[in-house]
Amino acid sequence: MGTRDWLTVSAAAIIMLSGSASAAQLDGVTLPDAVSLDGTELHLNGIALRTYSWLGIHIYVAGLYLEHPSHDAEAILDSPEKKLLAVRFVHNVDVANARQAWREGFEDNCRAPCHLAPSDVERFLAAMPSMRAGDHSTLAFTREGLKITMNGKTLATITDPMFSRAVLATFIGPKPPTPRLKRELLHNTK
């Protein structure tokens, strides 16, 4: 292939990438508009910033990816479709605070008839490390269960559908960390 052919291929690749490479940005974190999960394309439903305390300390940016975007939290939670929550930390979080936040989220969003196996909760919490600014985590929800990764490394896989629902509910359920986080992940402007 000659120089002219390489230039043509390169120009075509740049045109294709520029047409399809769009992204959302928040607090210096860029998330793609679409990701692939086990061969299924998921679309960015909403992007949100998690803040803490009245000081508004920025903790992480999260993006919720769905097969079919929706503003309806219950429909998303009840859907068997694949979902992915991408989290990019912008502040350090120690392991004790992370585990306590998860415990509170489960207590607030897993009310009867929701029941989580204590062994699943403990395995999930035990897998949680301290987070540093720049770390990235994914929570992948499929029919097979929940897969949690941190910086590309699998931390845990839990197959209970109720557990998967409860984890996602901690972000978009009745009592999210902040109403704004839920509203932005659902891309609701109300």
Q: What feature does the model see in each segment?
A:
Residues 3-7:
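N-terminal export leaders
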Residues 23-77, 112:
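N-terminal secretory signal peptides
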Residues 155-181:
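Flexible glycine-rich active-site/ligand-binding loops centered on an Asp-His dyad
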